[in-house]
A protein has these predicted regions:
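Cleavable N-terminal export/targeting peptides
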Residues: 1-30
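Outer-membrane beta-barrel proteins
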Residues: 19-25, 63-66, 94-99, 129-131, ...
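Short glycine/proline- and aromatic-enriched beta-strand/turn motifs that initiate or cap beta-hairpins
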Residues: 24-77
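Residues that define the transmembrane beta-barrel architecture of outer-membrane proteins
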Residues: 29, 51-55, 83-87, 117-123, ...
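Repeated loop/turn-to-beta-strand initiation elements of outer-membrane beta-barrel proteins
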Residues: 31, 65-71, 99-105, 131-137, ...
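Transmembrane beta-strands of outer-membrane beta-barrel pores
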Residues: 37-43, 73-77, 95, 109-113, ...
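Outer-membrane beta-barrel architecture
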Residues: 58-60, 90-93, 106, 124-128, ...
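Outer-membrane beta-barrel "beta-signal"
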Residues: 159, 189-198, 204-206, 217-231
Length: 231
């Protein structure tokens, strides 16, 4: 995988896509998409790209009743050999329970072309309060293709700052069967800002001692830059 070339392509798309998107009527379209460039694809505190940059892209169709389906892709690097990328498929349902509470549930299929033994499903439920606070619960009965039950719990909050910046916090914990792995904690604190269809964030992420013992340098604390364009 040529991470530098992929990231350069993503950054070009970030700069040019808003001009193409301006001709579209976002409000009338059930389709949404995003293209992202990241300095490191970090998932639950652990690098999925061997601490290198990559590009990501997603596409979603949402029905008038809140049912949605789509796909998402990212480069990955787990060492020598396959896979070179992750391709996820998902279907879900999103609904506003009232004026301040939103509920979302989805089934995500993680796939790794060329390394199908890593494929697995995960059920993810997220409740958002007042748009700025959320709680996420996730469960897989075959985490990482290991035939192991795994749970994930995450809480996140965002606080508005001057000039439309946002201060973002997140803390999560992964729970595994004892014979598979120790449980570990991950966290993130960062600043983000949207510029119309383009958004940017800079976050400092890490894990606790258990996470570092399990994943080594891939779980070391680091700064992650994300640039995203989407409609």
């Amino acid at each position: 995988m040529n991470s530098k070339r992929i990231l350069a392509s993503a950054l070009f798309a970030l700069l040019t896509a808003p001009f193409a998107a301006s001709a579209q009527d976002e409000a009338s379209s059930p389709f949404s998409w995003n293209i992202t460039g990241v300095s490191d694809y970090v998932w639950r505190g652990v690098s999925q790209t061997d601490e290198n940059p990559t590009a990501q892209a997603g596409f979603t169709y949402t029905s008038p009743v809140g049912v949605y389906a789509g796909a998402w892709a990212s480069g990955v690097d787990f060492g020598d050999g396959d896979p070179d990328y992750e391709l996820d498929y998902f279907v879900g349902y999103n609904v506003d329970l009232n004026e301040t509470v939103n509920f979302d549930i989805l089934l995500n299929r993680y796939t790794y072309p060329g390394a199908s033994e890593l494929n697995f499903n995960e059920l993810i439920a997220k409740t958002t309060f007042a748009e700025d606070y959320s709680v996420t619960l996730a469960y897989s009965n075959d985490f990482g293709g290991s035939e192991t039950d795994a749970f994930y719990v995450n809480g996140a909050a965002s606080y508005g700052l001057p000039q439309d910046y946002s201060l973002d916090f997140s803390v999560g914990r992964s729970f595994f069967e004892r014979e598979y792995s120790e449980n570990y904690l991950d966290w993130s604190v960062g600043v983000s800002k949207s510029f119309g269809a383009v958004s940017a964030s800079l976050a400092y992420v890490g894990v606790d001692g258990n996470g570092r013992d399990i994943y080594g340098e891939l779980a070391s604390s680091r700064v992650v830059l994300t640039l995203d364009v989407g409609m």
